[in-house]
């Protein structure tokens, strides 16, 4: 007897071979994903054990390596903190695979929104152009960017590890503040939703102006107050290239996790993932780039901001 998930399992198998799905299949998949994501909270609760991952940026073969090292989904539960697309050569295959896994195993994988899951940013940094190249039109780009509006903004592991792409906001004191806003929209240029996806921890105290032009920098005093107010042990975030794949800040109140090794195929960094076990103990696993088969011939006309 054929399994009710046969078609989806077949799609996942094709995607694991780095083969894009036809446009009608992408559309149907994103419709199913939207129904699942609509039900998720702005602060999505997640149970341990779970493996927390940072930016992927279209580096498909390195995502396959991440699953090889961390365990296949659904054998391992995963929480991804955004930035699936742009910069790497395989944004289409990367984001389609993660969305397909979400539809197939909704309780086993959580996919948060990053600052690159936006219409505006993807038109500059590669995903839009890649969709045009692979499909001959912008329909798949539109389908995915419409879906991105439904991705949860943050997650909370066992009520004590707060996970999000960027960082904190001067407009947000409590997790309830986040639970109460309407996330189904393009990432705004400013305000609390923007800050969650764009802010960075900093060595200086207090709030600072971000060199990125969006979000803020926040000091250890801010992290400590936020963690204290919300009974948190740790803030886990992504958004910044760190050479070892992970980096502690604010006396271990904040950790940055970056999961794209040799970022942009030239930065020479390690990648890492963070395993949180049943006892809420955590272990970082570092990994290097997967062996590369020749890269596609793509002209790079994107500006280099390395943040």
From Swiss-Prot:
Its cofactor is Mn(2+). The keyword Iron-sulfur does not apply. Its main location: cytoplasm. Signal peptide: none annotated. One of its GO terms (cellular component) is cytosol. Its EC number is 3.1.3.16. Binds 2 manganese ions per subunit. GO terms for biological process: mitotic cell cycle. It catalyses: O-phospho-L-seryl-[protein] + H2O = L-seryl-[protein] + phosphate; O-phospho-L-threonyl-[protein] + H2O = L-threonyl-[protein] + phosphate. Mn(2+) 1 binds at residues 55, 57, 83. Keywords: Cytoplasm, Hydrolase, Manganese, Metal-binding, Protein phosphatase. InterPro entries: Calcineurin-like_PHP_ApaH, Metallo-depent_PP-like, PPA2-like, Ser/Thr-sp_prot-phosphatase. One of its GO terms (molecular function) is protein serine/threonine phosphatase activity. Mn(2+) 2 binds at residues 83, 115, 165, 239. The active site is at residue 116. It is found in: Cytoplasm. SUPFAM superfamilies: Metallo-dependent phosphatases. Belongs to the PPP phosphatase family. PP-2A subfamily. This is Serine/threonine-protein phosphatase PP2A-2 catalytic subunit. It comes from Oryza sativa subsp. japonica (Rice). The gene is PP2A2.
